């Protein structure tokens, strides 16, 4: 039930190996990448934090020998704590709190934006958990989802002159591409073993880890 550990490990090592390749060889792009973008590293850490909640849940299931891990109340509390840490991190960015309902029309929602972020992350994580009832469903949809993000982030990197207001750091979009491609590759590799009949179950570790799509 803890097959998601392989997805998390595959993502970490894929991301690390890609950066080692850039640091040592650097071929393929006319850029020199000698660091990991802090924003992308934070996403990786946040994914690990949320996955740790799923790990506790899965570990209790294995330890008790039955399909009962954390109860709903404790699980939600832990998810809210992690989501609050993530929300506070975004708060330190001094981002705009204006919510645009229509083009040219926005409403300043103030501090409510950070509560919305917490609600969105917790809600998205549990929504993904609901889709984990069929073999290969979460792994398959996650592969497609992260694959789509990969196309967008890499496109922005290759056309960075058109997105200077959106991506001030040219390496940010490329580093995001590396991260999401690592996750997509891990999900795709896991899908081989998770299709019906599943030999390995994803578990709450991977379900919680794939909440990165919410960011």
For each predicted feature, which ranges?
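"…together with the soluble PPM/PP2C metallo-phosphatase catalytic core" -> "…together
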Residues: 1-213
């Amino acid at each position: 039930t803890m097959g998601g550990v392989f997805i998390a490990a595959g993502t970490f090592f894929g991301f690390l190996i890609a950066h080692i390749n850039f640091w040592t060889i650097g071929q393929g792009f006319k850029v020199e990448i000698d660091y990991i973008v802090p924003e992308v590293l934070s996403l990786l850490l946040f994914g690990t934090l949320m996955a740790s909640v799923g790990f506790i849940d899965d570990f209790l299931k294995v330890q008790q020998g039955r399909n009962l891990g954390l109860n709903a109340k404790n699980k939600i509390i832990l998810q809210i704590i992690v989501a609050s840490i993530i929300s506070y991190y975004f708060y330190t960015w001094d981002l705009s709190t204006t919510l645009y309902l229509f083009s040219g029309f926005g409403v300043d929602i103030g501090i409510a934006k950070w509560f919305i972020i917490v609600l969105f992350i917790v809600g998205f994580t549990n929504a993904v958990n609901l889709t984990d009832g069929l073999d290969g469903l979460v792994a398959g949809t996650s592969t497609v989802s992260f694959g789509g993000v990969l196309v967008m982030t890499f496109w922005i990197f290759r056309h960075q002159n058109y997105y200077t207001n959106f991506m001030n750091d040219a390496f940010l979009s490329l580093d995001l591409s590396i991260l999401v491609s690592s996750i997509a590759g891990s999900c795709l590799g896991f899908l081989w073993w998770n299709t019906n009949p599943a030999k390995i179950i994803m578990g709450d570790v991977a379900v919680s880890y794939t909440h990165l799509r919410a960011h």
